Each structure stands twice: as structure tokens, then as C-alpha cells.
Amino acid sequence: MNYPFRDAALAFARGQTDAYALRDFLIGQQMNYPKPLYYSLMNLLGSHDVDRIRTALCTGVNIRSLSREEQVRLSFTDAQLAAAVETEKLCALLQFAIPGVPSIYYGDEQGMCGVCDPFNRQPFKEGVRELHDFYARLAAKRRGADALSTGEAVFMAASADVLMVLRYINGDKDALGERARPGAYLAVINRGAHSAGFTADCTAAGCGMFSGCIAAHSGRIFELSKEGQRE
């Protein structure tokens, strides 16, 4: 269970660290795990052991450090809850863009809230349909592209706010040496309050340099080719 990934993603999303630190963390995991283990990591944002991701994104407070009574008294405004949904999308895009297994704790895809055990174990209920649909689109895109699941990975930062993840398969073998469909994708995440330009070195995927602009507080996955690109 890749809790270090959760901690790093949360720190970036909350503005406690920057894209350079997150890039270095992702490279560190890539370098320190054998490939079969690395591509099997359970990349999670929530579980029964921690506060739910939407709740965590509503505050910079370490909820696990609070007493049970203090946790029960926590409350958030509608604006905080709405902003947390948008930030969760950025975390989810990263979760689905990196090597490993994107693991969703039940209800997180619906925007369920909850502090620590037992308050994070409430019965499942439907909530934010838009968030559910966003997760469904991420899952469909990853399922339809071998490069996004078992392709090679390159991590880059365009600025303190913009993280980039290049995933690719050259030829007919993936990163584990198994037969796979070739392809190249670039995930770009901008946590900043303003749109940002970026340039990514995609030469490892045979796609040269790729430049673009990403809207404020948003993420996109570009499909790359040697001739051009499309989202």
C-alpha cells in the first residue's frame, strides 16, 4: 500500500511542496523499487487507515494528529468541499498516470467525506456524480492504452506548479518485457491559480519536444505521435 505516494500527492495538492519535490519523489520510488514491484504498487489516495481524500483536501491540518472528539467537531464550508472535489481530480489524474495499480477506496469516487477510523467507514452512498464520471473516464483511458499502465515513465516539472508524466511504449514490448501496444501519452497537472505554458522532452518516446498551455487548476492527458498530438 503506497502511503508515501498519498502523502506526496497531498503535500503537492495542498501547496506544502512543489512540482519539483513531487517529481523527485516519483523518481526516487522508480529508482528504488525493482520493476515487478514498482509496477504492482497499490497507489492509493484513501483507505480505512486514513482520512478520506476529500476531507484531507479541505484542510491543511493533519487530521490523524487530532483527538477523536476534535475530529468529530471538524466541519467545512460548501466552498471548501467544492474546491476539494476539483483538487481531488488532480490527485486522481496523477494516480492513474503513474506506474502501479490505481486503487480507489470505496466512495472516494463519489466524494464521500470522513475523518479517521471509524468515520471513514460509513455506508456507501452516491454523491458527486461529476467526480464519479471523471474517475470513470480516467479508468477507461488507462484501460485502453497499454502505455498508461505498463509503459515506461519519465517524470518532469515545468514549474513549481506544473508536473508532467510521460508514459510510452516503443515497439511491441512494455516496461516489463511483455507484448503490448505501442503508444505515448503526456499527463500534465497544473495546481496553480493561473494558466501555464509548458515544454516536455518527449524524445524518449520518439515524439521530440512538446509544448502547450494548461488551464489553471486542471489536468490533461495528451496522446502523442511523431506527427502531432491529440487529447
Residue spans of the language-model regions?
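Aromatic- and carboxylate-lined catalytic core of secreted/periplasmic carbohydrate-active enzymes
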Residues: F124-A158, S218
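Acyl/amide activation-and-transfer machinery of modular secondary-metabolite enzymes
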Residues: D117-P123
